[in-house]
From Swiss-Prot:
Belongs to the short-chain dehydrogenases/reductases (SDR) family. The lineage of its organism: Bacteria, Bacillati, Bacillota, Bacilli, Bacillales. It is an enzyme of class 1 (oxidoreductase). It comes from Bacillus subtilis (strain 168). InterPro entries: NAD(P)-bd_dom_sf, Sc_DH/Rdtase_CS, SDR_fam. This is Uncharacterized oxidoreductase YhxD.
Length: 299
């Protein structure tokens, strides 16, 4: 028998039923029950990103928050983007980044606006003194059971936030990105196995896969790598603010189909992948998608 202190992954994080809950979108992480684990108390860095300059969209909560915290603890200065309504969560992230002795830049705004995306990149580059990591995590997800009830306005907005903003941010950032820079997008298991109530969201996540693979090939000659992360059911404000029907929240991650690990993932469980893809440890990795799904297939 091994003497190592291993943990059963089924029990590594919260694995009971969640309380039924709902917040008006976009929702605040600080008001969730339980509050998602983004590594605030557990993530320990080792200098993998010393001196780097990162922009993280959706950096106030959930997966983006976990990436921002990890980047700071690995030695990077970090700019985060979020919606103005998410300011309370963003202020917490700012404190966590600055506690590591790193610079934190808060830039609220709506990614569905192309001009804002351009300004976001310019401000990030100016205030950080450079830019060499784009972690594009922000997303919009609203469940609608029947296509007849899916508003055209929602379809447009979901594509603008989830897909169009990637084009706008990357186009604005390319003049600043040096050789060795890394672009990380965020797709989803929904891009491979769509839920019937997430037609617009799933379509955007499939589009992100094509965008990532193609852009990685296009930018390889410039020495810029492009990869994506495909989360499974992760406990974030996206889920409790309309991303899932309220009645599905208690068994989120345990529903149909369930993750084989039979629980929702926590944002901190993706942090190492965002660090790896930003760091030189992934120097031979581009145009790839990394699934962090609790065992749900991505093929």
């Amino acid at each position: 028998m091994s003497d190592s202190n291993l943990t059963n992954p089924i029990k590594a994080f919260f694995h009971d039923e969640f309380p039924e809950q709902y917040q008006e979108p976009p929702g605040l992480q600080k008001n969730m029950k339980p509050v998602p684990d983004c590594g605030e108390k557990s993530y320990k860095g080792s200098g993998k990103l010393t001196g780097r300059k990162a922009l993280v969209t959706g950096g106030d909560s959930g997966i983006g928050r976990a990436a921002a915290i990890a980047y700071a603890r690995e030695g990077a200065d970090v700019a985060i983007n979020y919606l103005p309504e998410e300011q309370p969560d963003a202020e917490e992230v700012k404190e966590l980044i600055e506690a590591e002795g790193r610079k934190a830049v808060l830039i609220p705004g709506d990614l569905s606006d192309e001009s804002f995306c351009q300004d976001l990149v310019k401000q990030s580059h100016h205030e950080l003194g450079g830019l060499d990591v784009l972690a594009l995590v922000a997303g919009k997800q609203q469940a609608v059971e029947n296509i007849e009830d899916l508003p055209t306005e929602q379809i447009y907005k979901t594509f603008e936030v989830n897909v169009f903003s990637l084009y706008w941010v990357v186009k604005a950032a390319l003049p600043y990105l040096p050789e060795g820079a890394s672009i990380i997008t965020t797709t989803s298991v929904e891009g491979y196995n769509p839920s019937p109530m997430l037609l617009d969201y799933a379509a955007t996540k499939n589009a992100i896969i094509g965008f990532t693979v193609g852009l990685g090939k296009q930018l390889a000659s410039k020495g810029i790598r492009v990869n994506s992360v495909a989360p499974g059911p992760i406990w974030t404000p996206l889920q409790i603010s309309g991303g899932q029907p309220t009645e599905n929240i208690p068994k989120f991650g345990q529903g149909t189909p369930p993750a084989p690990l039979n629980r929702a993932g926590q944002p901190v469980e993706l942090a190492d992948v965002y660090v790896f893809l930003a760091s030189e440890n992934s120097s031979y990795v581009t145009s790839q998608v990394y699934g962090i799904t609790g065992g749900i297939p991505t093929a």
